[in-house]
From Swiss-Prot, chain B:
Entry keyword annotation includes Transmembrane helix: yes
Superkingdom of source: Eukaryota
InterPro entries: Yip1/4-like, Yip1_dom
Record membrane topology: Multi-pass membrane protein
GO cellular component terms listed in the entry, alphabetical order: Golgi medial cisterna; Golgi membrane; Golgi trans cisterna; trans-Golgi network
Name of the molecule in the record: Protein YIPF6
PANTHER family: GOLGI MEMBRANE PROTEIN YIP1, PROTEIN YIPF6
Membrane side Cytoplasmic: residue ranges: 1-84, 133-142, 202-208
Places the protein is found: Golgi apparatus membrane
Chief site of localization: Golgi
One Pfam family of this chain: Yip1
Any one of the GO BP annotations: endoplasmic reticulum to Golgi vesicle-mediated transport
Family under the similarity heading: Belongs to the YIP1 family.
């Protein structure tokens, strides 16, 4: 009796396994195959009938039962494994999804980790902004760098807004992507990328500076950029820009260079580190000004205006030349081969 | 234990034994609903929305959204916007603003006008950044509450956009630009003021300026987009 009940359990498991298999096949097609579904249901009903009959037979003749049961078990084992595999895959998918969700939640919950870097008073921020324009001529003793991210982050966002304004007013056209994405990418890319690079160089040159301090230093250094860009995007005088570039941009660069100088030992190292920093910082301002300014607008217009007759037409004229050249080449090769 | 239970049983029997032959006169009502009258307030009525008409449901939601619009237009120190937040109003405002900014240059492909996606992303990304910033500064406001307030406070700017389009329909002269400038400036101030009124309380008092700056920047960018919008002439 116990045996028969065991086999019946197996049989029901088989039924479920078979059903699972069919479901998987259906799911793979991404469209529910009605024929397949019908097959499944039909077969399952038949199976049910068979099971019923078999159970009755088993009850009637007790000796034949173990053999059949074993066979069924072996046969059903395979199907059971397949069903379990499907279940396992689904389980793993579920687990992965859960992990992702919990990671996102943890990120939000772990916002407290970042909170110390945003622990500032308005007056402190104002003072640091002003100090970012005042180079301190004290290089014998390491200068203090505030490890704080509120000011830099806000300056980067301000610069994004100013860049957007500059792009719009100069009529810049970006073929692939939006103005917004380009502005954000440029500003954050510069801030994070150059900070990492400077940190790397500082590591090579044995300067005493941490990543956080680099981010803060470079971030506050963008204050001068913001002022210069905001003024020169609205007032278009090249001489004015160059004066501002040298004075304001130069001051903020000098400030950073002085800080780095005070934290590095050795002339070569100082030269490498400060030269890299100053060059990158000043050239970035130059790039931002001229990339989204009226001068470039003219170039963009000539590039975009394909209806204007000019050098663009050369492309159209060049096109038929290419097959000619290819034909000539092939003809020559053929000639050479025939000889 | 059994002893005490037995004692309790017998005790209660003894207690209530006297009540069996107490008669209650007919005029005192002894039957009724076993609900506490204080509990059956509006809360329970709100919850039983299964059998109400769909119209009622929609109208209630619309009323809630409209009520919040009113709150933005008359920014008082009220917690209605904060208490039951929803994102329907912000969605409607954001989509309508983006559509209006898009409409003028849908026909011409290559002018640097604001695209629908761009406006949409600026609004939501900006709101998320402001919210995260306020959380980082130690604000005591939930994520979606802040999103809700910032979204609803775009309402003045959407109105400004509407006015700008109407003005642009009439004329393209310098006078129309001055009118637009005034309207946008006023509405920008209104937006910033309203959102500050709702959100400033959640910030520590010494850091209010730090939390307000990104809000100012956010609405400044949007209002600047509204101002520079120009239909293709």
């Amino acid at each position: 009796m116990a045996n028969s009940s065991g086999s019946s359990r197996n049989l029901t498991a088989a039924d479920w396994g078979g059903f699972d298999d069919n479901m998987q096949a259906g799911a793979g097609a991404a469209v529910i195959d009605m024929e397949n579904m019908d097959d499944t249901s039909g077969s399952s009903f038949e199976d049910m009938g068979e099971i019923h009959q078999r159970l009755k037979e088993e009850e009637e003749e007790g000796e034949g039962a173990p053999e059949e049961g074993e066979e069924d078990g072996a046969f059903l084992g395979m199907k059971g494994v397949k069903g379990q595999l499907g279940r396992q895959v689904a389980d793993e998918m579920w687990q992965a999804g859960k992990r992702q969700a919990s990671k996102a939640f943890n990120l939000y919950a772990n916002i407290d980790i970042l909170r110390p870097y945003f622990d500032v008073e308005p007056i402190q921020v104002r003072n640091r902004l002003l100090e970012s324009m005042i180079p301190v001529k004290m290089i014998s003793f390491p200068q203090k760098i505030a490890g704080e991210l509120y000011g830099p982050l806000m300056l980067v966002f301000t610069m994004v807004a100013i860049l957007l304004h500059g792009m719009k007013s100069s009529g810049t056209i970006i073929r692939e992507g939006t103005l917004m994405g380009t502005a954000i990418g440029t500003c954050f890319g510069y801030w994070l990328g150059v900070s990492s690079f400077i940190y790397f160089v500082a590591y090579l040159c044995n300067a005493q500076i941490t990543m956080l301090q680099t981010l803060s230093l470079l971030g506050y250094g963008l204050f001068g950029h913001c002022i210069v860009l905001f003024i020169t995007y609205n007032i278009h005088f090249h001489s004015l820009f160059y004066i501002f570039w040298l004075c304001i941009g130069g001051l903020s660069t000098l400030r950073m260079v002085a800080v780095l100088l005070s934290r590095t030992v050795g002339h070569t190292q100082r030269l490498i580190l400060c030269g890299t920093m100053a060059a990158l910082h000043m050239l970035f301002l130059l790039y931002l000004h001229f990339a989204y300014h009226k001068v470039v607008e003219g170039i963009l217009d000539t590039l975009d205006g394909q209806h204007i007759p000019g050098p663009i037409q050369r492309v159209a004229r060049d096109l038929p030349l290419v097959p000619n050249a290819v034909l000539n080449a092939t003809a020559q090769i053929l000639l050479a081969q025939s000889r | 234990m059994a002893e005490t239970e037995g004692f309790g049983d017998s005790g209660s029997k003894q207690l209530f034994a006297g009540l069996s032959n107490v008669s209650i006169s007919g005029d005192i009502p002894v039957e009724g609903e076993i609900t506490v009258p204080m509990a059956s307030t509006s809360q329970e009525d709100d919850l039983s929305t299964l059998d109400e008409p769909v119209k009622d449901t929609i109208m209630r939601d619309l009323k809630a959204v409209g009520n919040k619009f009113l709150h933005v237009m008359y920014p008082k120190k009220s917690t209605t916007l904060l208490r039951d937040w929803d994102l329907w109003g912000p969605l409607v405002l954001c989509v309508s603003l983006a559509l209006m900014l898009q409409g003028g240059n849908a026909d011409s492909k290559d002018d640097g006008g604001p695209q629908f996606a761009e406006v949409f992303v600026i609004i939501w990304f900006g709101a998320v950044v402001i919210t995260l910033n306020s959380k980082l500064l130690g604000g005591t406001i939930s994520f979606f509450q802040s999103l809700c307030v910032l979204g609803y406070c775009i309402l003045p700017l959407t109105v400004a956009m509407l006015v700008c389009r109407l003005v642009l329909l009439l004329s393209h002269t310098t006078a129309s630009f001055i009118v637009r400038l005034v309207v946008v400036t006023v509405m920008f101030a209104w937006s910033t003021f309203a959102s500050t009124a709702f959100l400033a309380d959640s910030q520590p008092p010494n850091r209010r300026a730090l939390a307000v700056y990104p809000i100012f920047l956010f609405y400044f960018v949007i209002s600047w987009m509204v101002l520079t919008f120009n239909t293709v002439s």
